[in-house]
């Protein structure tokens, strides 16, 4: 009779788990998940934990639709949801089709899990709870870091894999997005897995196999079901495959695109109700929506008129300096592979022109090129091209490993110092907590330098964090009315109040700052989105006096104002001497 080998007879398995390219990324990803989970609270929903970013503009839309997809529609219709009449009833009345369903479904699943296990305090009557869905983004971010680390480690060595996973975690903009119930982090996960699957499965022979084309096509469909940015994947992978395999790539590309489109259509029931009409409606939204304004180089610009260099400048300026430098090195230098056998591989991972390296670099460049094209709308900092950052983390891991190997050959101490300096970039995560979406690298002078350059310092109302709301409660008498500006959509202020136990306990009413000439509120809360927020001079001229300012790295991101009275006299500089200024720690 055959006996199963004991664990001691399988050193290879344990070596792979504990000492191979998997262990480091697992530890890094779990540490990131733990840190993010501790810092999700926007408004005193988890009073015993550190604060997280404030409720951002789009989160409540995503959570509401996620809860609809996971809880409301299945509860009302069950399996009868597949009935065409029920589909029409469910997906025409309450459903918001501004984005495909998969990302919101992901958030809805984790909303259900958290609400079942550990519902937050003070929001028992809310139809959905944003902070609970935020955990879904935290998990997606950890999985993205893990995928990047394992992929890089298996091809370029353990050091490169660990550095790649860590590079992603140490990007404050991505770390901040991982705290939000938004679609960007889930999109990053599906985009990254699709690119890495193509790089892994399509480079194993003389041409991509049909099976590999089907598998990556399924992932393409999942990406298309998450967010519009996935439309970049077919041209990216198509050009890459044709460049390396010429005519041999035509068949797998046809399979890849066909499967992706089938999965996309099959996974979105809303399309079934009026396929051509709804498909056109979805893809035309980017050109038919209302215009937004962007603050760039000291000017307020319409999103369609932003200069071509905006994505490049924002991408470069929002990366930590050493990760930027390591990524450049990883993009332009030859590198060693994991082992001699890998170096003999037909695709030679370490060579600059190898299929793997070119696809990773292409995944970075494609979003930047798209949003640099004339007439393509771009706004909200790096949010729309956040998919460019995971590929850069891989390049940074490769670049760091190159330097590390050279230093190790000369001086072990120098390699250790390099590692410590690289890890020290985590300082950005602490210094910008909880306003990670306002991070700028030291190579542009940090946030203060970016403000001096005329770059946008905040844009998504995350600066209305727990500390700022607590200041409102401290200053405003019970039952006061606080007006909010700028107002980017009608439900912004109602959802801020609904998701805030702090404001509800103090019976603070919240409303839009709709009439600057005749304000009806007692106080005014401003998040400093420069392109849309009223200027300080205008507020002073309307009779408002600053009460508190919330700053990060010396730059005001949110402020609280009240109507002028005898207790708040302006000095010649146009400010009040009793204004409190709070610096986030």
Feature names for model-found ranges:
Residues 1-43, 143-146, 153, 250-262, ...:
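Start-transfer (signal-anchor) and selected internal transmembrane alpha helices
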Residues 38-52, 103, 269-273, 278-286, ...:
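Catalytic lumenal/periplasmic loop and adjoining terminal transmembrane helix
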Residues 23, 28-30, 117-124, 146-170, ...:
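Transmembrane-helix signature of polytopic, membrane-embedded enzymes
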Residues 131, 135-156, 193, 197, ...:
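Transmembrane-helix motifs of polytopic, lipid-linked glycan transferases
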Residues 194-213:
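Membrane-interface transmembrane helices that cradle and orient dolichyl/undecaprenyl
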Residues 57, 133-140, 162-170, 174-193, ...:
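Multi-pass, polyprenyl lipid-linked donor-dependent membrane glycosyltransferases
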Residues 20-59, 67, 74-76, 86-89, ...:
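Transmembrane signal-anchor helices characteristic of membrane glycosylation enzymes that use polyprenol
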């Amino acid at each position: 009779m055959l006996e199963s080998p004991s664990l001691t007879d399988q050193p290879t398995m344990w070596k792979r788990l504990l000492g191979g390219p998997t262990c480091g990324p697992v530890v890094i990803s779990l540490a990131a998940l733990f840190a993010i989970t501790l810092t999700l609270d926007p408004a005193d929903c988890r009073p015993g934990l550190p604060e997280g970013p404030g409720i951002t503009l789009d989160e409540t839309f995503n959570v509401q639709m996620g809860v609809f997809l996971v809880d409301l529609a299945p509860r009302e219709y069950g399996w009868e949801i597949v009935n065409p009449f029920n589909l029409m009833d469910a997906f025409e009345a309450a459903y918001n089709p501004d984005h495909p369903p998969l990302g919101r479904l992901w958030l809805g699943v984790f909303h259900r899990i958290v609400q079942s296990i550990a519902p937050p305090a003070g929001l028992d009557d809310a139809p959905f709870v944003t902070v609970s869905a935020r955990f879904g983004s935290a998990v997606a971010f950890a999985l993205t870091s893990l995928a990047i680390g394992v992929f890089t480690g298996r091809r370029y060595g353990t050091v490169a894999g660990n550095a790649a996973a860590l590079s992603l975690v140490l990007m404050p903009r991505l770390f901040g997005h991982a705290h939000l119930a938004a679609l960007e982090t889930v999109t990053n996960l599906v985009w990254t897995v699709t690119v890495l699957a193509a790089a892994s499965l399509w480079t194993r022979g003389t041409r991509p196999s049909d099976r590999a084309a089907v598998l990556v096509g399924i992932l393409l469909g999942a990406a298309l079901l998450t967010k519009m940015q996935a439309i970049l994947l077919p041209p990216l992978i198509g050009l890459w495959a044709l460049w390396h395999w010429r005519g041999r790539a035509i068949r797998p590309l046809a399979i890849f695109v066909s499967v992706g489109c089938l999965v996309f259509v099959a996974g979105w029931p809303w399309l079934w109700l009026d396929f051509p009409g709804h498909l056109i409606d979805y893809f035309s939204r980017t050109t038919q929506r209302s215009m937004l304004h962007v603050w760039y180089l000291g000017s307020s610009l319409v999103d369609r008129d932003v200069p071509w260099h905006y994505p490049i400048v924002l991408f470069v300026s929002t990366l930590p300096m050493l990760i930027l430098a390591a990524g450049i090195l990883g993009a332009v230098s030859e590198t060693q592979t994991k082992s001699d056998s890998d170096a003999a591989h037909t695709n030679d991972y370490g060579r600059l022109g190898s299929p793997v390296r070119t696809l990773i670099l292409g995944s970075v460049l494609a979003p930047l090129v798209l949003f640099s094209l004339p007439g393509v709308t771009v706004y909200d900092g790096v949010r729309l091209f956040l998919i460019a950052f995971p590929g850069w983390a891989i390049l940074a891991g490769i670049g760091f490993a190159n330097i590390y190997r050279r230093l190790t050959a000369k001086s072990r101490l120098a390699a250790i110092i390099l590692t410590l300096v690289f890890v020290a970039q985590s300082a950005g995560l602490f210094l910008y907590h909880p306003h990670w979406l306002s991070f700028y690298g030291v190579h542009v002078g940090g946030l203060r330098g970016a403000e001096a350059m005329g770059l946008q310092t905040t844009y998504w109302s995350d600066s209305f964090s727990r500390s700022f709301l607590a200041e409102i409660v401290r200053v405003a008498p019970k039952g006061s009315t606080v007006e909010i500006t700028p107002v980017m959509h009608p439900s912004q202020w109602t959802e801020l109040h609904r998701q805030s136990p702090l404001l509800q306990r103090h019976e603070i009413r919240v409303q839009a700052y709709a009439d600057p000439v005749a304000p009806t509120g007692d106080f005014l809360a401003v998040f400093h989105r420069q392109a849309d927020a009223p200027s300080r001079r205008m507020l002073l001229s309307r009779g408002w006096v600053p009460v508190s300012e919330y700053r990060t790295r010396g730059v005001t991101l949110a402020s609280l104002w009240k109507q002028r009275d005898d207790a708040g006299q302006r000095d010649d500089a146009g400010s009040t001497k009793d204004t409190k200024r709070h610096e986030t720690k």
